[in-house]
Amino acid sequence: LTSAPCVVVMAGTATTIDTLDGDGRFLGGFILPGLDLMRRSLERNTAALPLAAGKYRAWPRCTDDAIASGGIEAQAGAIERAVVRLGNGAMCLLSGGAAALIGEHLGIAQRRVDNLVLEGLLRLAGDLPAAHASGKTNS
């Protein structure tokens, strides 16, 4: 999808932030609770916070909006830090159920790729005959 260094974000129940160098080598990554898990954790593990149904606000003034906004800010901040740390014109690829919502609040260039895992598998499958013909195997 890109030959640039890349931050790959899968935003679902958990949010994974993985980094690849320009040659496609995995450098490392992070796992965060997803947006819904963050909300549910606050509701279950605090004495008085509700299961928030708030909306994102730049400066929230009620508890529900503060919880919803805090989750988005945490996700966006972790993603943006990974892109800055990777440097060298890193590309950010977003996928998963919360990708659109998080993407709206990122201050970095990004590309949304629906079904990123399937896209990657298809690309790998397309490379398999060439890899086997040249004698490369993963065993």
Where are these regions (language model features)?
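Conserved, helical-rich catalytic subdomain that frames metal- and/or nucleotide-binding sites
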Residues: 46, 50-54, 61-62
